């Protein structure tokens, strides 16, 4: 149900080189429970090619006897109009238990027809962002990427207006190097001049442990997933 708010405060200031934001809210106490307190601070420093930032949150949940503080430092570096590198370092502290994570991404668009990107993600088994954020799972290391080629220079006699060729991959383990299912796929998207589209996709998944379904339940912490492959054909009119 809903809870009354004792107070809420928001402050935002944006300048040419620095952005500052603060949010605070406190829930009212009820007859049989105490309200939660939420606080968030965002700082971002901008320059010509580099942006660096900080995000901090703190949540006090007295009913659960739980205090959660999260610190995140992030950056985005653009040496030119074609290349972008970004990343973040994260730390959560839940009742004095620390968790850590990081992500790094790279994107290169040398021309209008080609793009290539990669990402590296690491989250240990203690990091927890759930009090004032979201993390789909922890305890994993993943390398993921996409390479895409777009062809729009088709003959005038062609029935197609453009074609996209895409390679996707994701390699995963947990933080103890137990292999999790990894995936590879190739996709062809063909756009016709009558604005219908045809999509052809083939994919392959390796075998490995899956602990997302079980949520690491003590009696059955993971499922052994078999390898698999498949095809997909989709036509959109």
Spans of features found by a protein language model:
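Outer-membrane beta-barrel initiation region
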Residues: 1-46, 152-156
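Secondary-structure transition into beta-strands, especially the periplasmic turns and strand N-termini
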Residues: 16-19, 50, 83, 110, ...
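Glycine-rich, histidine-containing beta strand-loop boundary motifs that form or position
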Residues: 13-15, 22-26, 56, 89, ...
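Surface-exposed extracellular loop regions of Gram-negative outer-membrane beta-barrel proteins
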Residues: 20, 38-93, 153-166, 232-237
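Short, well-ordered alpha-helical packing segments
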Residues: 9-12, 40-44, 72-76, 84-88, ...
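Short, solvent-exposed loop/turn segments at secondary-structure boundaries
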Residues: 33, 64-66, 131-132
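Exposed, low-structure sequence patches enriched in small/polar residues
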Residues: 4, 88-237
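Beta-stranded membrane pore/translocator domains
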Residues: 1-3, 29, 61-64, 68, ...
């Amino acid at each position: 149900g809903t809870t009354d708010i004792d107070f809420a405060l928001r402050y935002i200031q944006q300048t040419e080189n620095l952005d500052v934001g603060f949010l605070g809210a406190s829930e009212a106490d009820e007859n049989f429970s105490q309200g939660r307190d939420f606080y968030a601070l965002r700082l971002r420093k901008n320059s010509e090619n580099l942006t660096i930032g900080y995000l901090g949150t703190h949540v006090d949940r007295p009913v659960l006897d739980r205090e959660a503080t999260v610190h995140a430092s992030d950056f985005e570096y653009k040496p030119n109009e074609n290349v972008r590198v970004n990343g973040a370092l994260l730390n959560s502290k839940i009742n004095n238990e620390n968790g850590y994570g990081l992500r790094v991404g790279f994107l290169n668009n040398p021309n209008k027809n080609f793009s290539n990107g990669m990402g590296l993600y690491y989250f240990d088994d203690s990091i927890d962002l759930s009090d004032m954020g979201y993390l789909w799972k922890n305890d994993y290391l993943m390398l993921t990427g996409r390479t895409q080629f777009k062809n729009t220079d088709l003959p005038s006699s062609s029935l197609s207006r453009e074609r996209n060729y895409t390679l996707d991959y994701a390699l995963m383990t947990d933080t103890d190097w137990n292999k999790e299912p990894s995936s590879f796929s190739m996709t062809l998207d063909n756009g016709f001049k009558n604005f219908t589209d045809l999509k052809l996709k083939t994919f392959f998944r390796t075998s490995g442990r899956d602990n997302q379904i079980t949520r690491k339940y003590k009696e059955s912490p993971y499922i052994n997933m078999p390898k698999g492959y498949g095809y997909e054909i989709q036509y959109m009119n």
